[in-house]
């Protein structure tokens, strides 16, 4: 079975073709970073308009690269939420139009489930059960995953996501947009010991997170530097390194605690922050004494992408959790959508 998947929840337009038997066949991605840079962040209306321009050409590109025609597609999948309402509606409309034209089923997919399952696209594929660390600009959660559609929340951020802490801290340092990757690049040349920053909830004993206090601490350091003439290049690099070290230390500690509490030996890390090299290195070090292992999606699939949506749909089909009835062309999207809502075992 071949599924054509569409992702349009924020500022990336992604399309992919996945086979339930052969895996990922082709995928294409367009990022809107250049368009949003002058505004310092994502402008929802501009994002929606760009998705309209990109979705169909990307679909044609994917089909051509996979050597497929529309007649070869058996189902269509799309991100139904969470995300920006207008952006989600574009992806849903395009996917539903493809489905209607060919009389195919259209499968709505939860954006976070796409991220959560994306490391299964790579080899070696982790077996169930495992602990998942979902860490991005909008979400920071620890989940126990016992199978497709079988997710239990272990802990989550009580305020800001880790990715937001990266992005907002970078903006405070004048690093531009997108801030997280810029901060990580600058941190490579900095000394994290120069600035003492808090590790919020590091010793709380639970698996929840909080990053708002860290952002406030970074703001305080920036204002202190401004009173003395501002951050020079060395100080900016050191503050970036200290910020990254604080975020990563908390993520690693909570992930290790989750493995110990569950007794599991496999950790799946997904979401944009999963591309962070320091996080990957320190997790590998921390898990080694436990006899545990971390699994990451390929770097190209850490950001939002169509491959994870098509793949999540394929996994739901194989698990009997997706309706394959054609002719159900609802345009409902859910900008706010709890992952727990899809864990009851009913078709999406």
From Swiss-Prot:
Reactions accelerated catalytically: L-threonylcarbamoyladenylate + adenosine(37) in tRNA = N(6)-L-threonylcarbamoyladenosine(37) in tRNA + AMP + H(+)
Binding site for Fe cation: 111, 115, 304
Enzyme class at the top of the EC tree: transferase
Gene3D superfamilies according to UniProt: 3.30.420.40
Cofactor(s) demanded: Fe(2+)
Pfam families: TsaD (PF00814)
Cofactor, how bound (note): Binds 1 Fe(2+) ion per subunit.
Entry's Gene Ontology cellular component terms: cytoplasm
Biological process terms in GO annotation: tRNA threonylcarbamoyladenosine modification
UniProt keyword tRNA processing present: yes
GO molecular-function term, one example from the UniProt record: iron ion binding
Family that this chain belongs to: Belongs to the KAE1 / TsaD family.
The protein's name in its UniProt record: tRNA N6-adenosine threonylcarbamoyltransferase
Taxonomic classification: Bacteria, Pseudomonadati, Pseudomonadota, Betaproteobacteria, Burkholderiales
């Amino acid at each position: 079975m071949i599924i054509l998947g569409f992702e349009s929840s924020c500022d990336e337009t992604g399309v992919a073709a996945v086979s339930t038997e052969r895996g990922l066949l082709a995928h294409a991605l367009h990022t809107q970073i250049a368009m949003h840079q002058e505004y310092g962040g994502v402008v929802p209306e501009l994002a929606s308009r760009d998705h309209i321009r990109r979705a169909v050409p990307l679909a044609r590109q994917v089909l051509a690269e996979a050597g497929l025609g529309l007649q070869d597609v058996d189902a269509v999948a799309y991100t139904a939420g969470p995300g920006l309402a207008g952006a989600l509606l574009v992806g849903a409309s395009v996917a539903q139009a493809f489905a209607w034209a060919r009389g195919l089923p259209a499968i709505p997919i939860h954006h976070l489930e796409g991220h959560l399952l994306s490391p299964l696209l790579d080899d070696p594929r982790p077996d169930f059960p495992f602990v998942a660390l979902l860490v991005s600009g909008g979400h920071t959660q620890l989940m126990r995953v016992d199978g497709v559609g079988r997710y239990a929340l272990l802990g989550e951020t009580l305020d800001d996501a880790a990715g937001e802490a990266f992005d907002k801290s970078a903006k405070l340092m004048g690093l531009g947009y997108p801030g997280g990757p810029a901060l990580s690049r600058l941190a490579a040349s900095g000394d994290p010991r120069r600035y003492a920053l808090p590790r919020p909830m590091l010793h709380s004993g639970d698996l929840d997170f909080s990053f708002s206090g860290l952002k406030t601490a970074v703001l305080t350091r920036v204002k202190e530097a401004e009173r003395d003439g501002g951050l020079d290049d060395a100080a900016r690099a050191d503050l970036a390194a200290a910020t990254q070290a604080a975020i990563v230390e908390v993520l690693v500690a909570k992930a290790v605690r989750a493995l110990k509490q569950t007794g599991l030996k496999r950790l799946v890390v997904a979401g944009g922050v999963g591309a962070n090299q320091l996080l990957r290195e320190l997790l590998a070090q921390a898990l080694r004494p436990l006899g545990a292992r971390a699994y990451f999606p390929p770097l190209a699939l850490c950001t939002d992408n169509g491959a994870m949506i098509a793949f999540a749909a394929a996994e739901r089909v194989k698990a009997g959790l997706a309706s394959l009835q054609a002719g159900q062309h609802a345009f409902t999207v859910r900008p706010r959508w709890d992952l727990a809502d899809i864990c009851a075992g009913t078709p999406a």
